Amino acid sequence: MINDLVSDALTRIRNAGMRRLDVTTLVHSKSVEALANILVEKGYIESCNVVEDGVKKTINVVLKYSDNGKSVINEMKRISKPGRRVYKGKDEIKRFKNGYGTIIVSTSHGVLPNDKAYALGVGGEVMCTVW
């Protein structure tokens, strides 16, 4: 049984990128779906769609590669873990990697990238960083 679905999703995307796979499958949850939608919005992955097999749901993620065949994602790192939650205020999530990276934050307004969370003036639990 998987205890941390977000870490599992990040690991599956990272491993698929290293193997140069076109598509990978993630276990569905609302937070993983929101995370995948943010990655699509920010241009780190091509697309994601929810697939229902009866009761079980999964998310198919189409990965994105540069012209030389290298994955667009350089690094994905889980920050807040089940054993150690990490929370940041709005001023602490303003920029990451001089604007080249993204911090994904779980806020009271839902799961948001750092630029939208800063614009709304909210902080929250730092799920992961991507660049």
UniProtKB/Swiss-Prot annotation:
Keyword Iron: no
Sorted UniProt keywords: Ribonucleoprotein, Ribosomal protein, RNA-binding, rRNA-binding
InterPro entries: Ribosomal_uS8, Ribosomal_uS8_CS, Ribosomal_uS8_sf
Gene3D superfamilies referenced in this protein's UniProt entry, alphabetically: 3.30.1370.30, 3.30.1490.10
Subunit structure: Part of the 30S ribosomal subunit. Contacts proteins S5 and S12.
PANTHER family, alphabetized: 40S RIBOSOMAL PROTEIN S15A
Family: Belongs to the universal ribosomal protein uS8 family.
Protein name per Swiss-Prot or TrEMBL: Small ribosomal subunit protein uS8
